[in-house]
Regions:
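Terminal targeting signals and extreme-terminal segments of soluble enzymes
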Residues: 1-163
Length: 163
């Protein structure tokens, strides 16, 4: 099975955050003010990770682990949410996928790093069983750093699972 580079399976997506993405909001000067619900952010991050995993493996994938979901800053209604996602590391049947979320204030243009997480997806064959994935080929220094860090995280996950 031929490997794939990080850029071959990475994705970037944008979403306008609307009132229905918020748990609560109010109007100030006829503008909706409120924060996007964390569950909506997590859903969008899981969805893009699934797309990256499918793009990399050529298979449907199942989420096995969502690790280290961190919320650094809120995303507000009216912001553009930007998701950047790529495969950091591959095992035999699984892939660690890194996701970075940013919020862009469309009025000021200011971009804020809001969330990050790692997700492990498992490729699934036509019978619902885990199947092999192409190995990731890190090219850039950043790709290589992410690969090295992801390998350490993967080894820790394996240790925890086997203890």
């Amino acid at each position: 099975m031929k490997g794939k580079t990080v850029k071959e399976s990475s994705l970037v997506s944008s979403h306008l955050m609307l009132m229905e993405h918020s748990g609560n909001f109010l109007f100030v000067n006829n503008r909706p003010i409120g924060m996007v619900h964390g569950g909506k952010i997590m859903t969008l991050m899981d969805e893009i990770a699934g797309m990256v995993g499918a793009k990399h493996s050529g298979r449907h994938v199942a989420t096995a682990v969502i690790e280290k979901m961190q919320f650094f800053a809120p995303i507000f209604i009216g912001n553009k949410m930007i998701l950047k996602s790529s495969v950091n590391y591959t095992g035999t049947t699984s892939m660690e996928i890194g996701i970075r979320s940013e919020a862009e204030d469309l009025i000021t243009g200011k971009i804020t790093h809001t969330n990050s997480c790692y997700l492990v997806a498992v490729a699934i064959d036509d019978y619902g069983k885990p199947c092999k994935v192409p190995q990731i080929i890190p090219e850039t220094d950043d790709d290589k750093r992410r690969f090295k860090e992801a390998k350490i995280r993967n080894n820790k996950r394996l240790e925890e699972r086997n203890s």
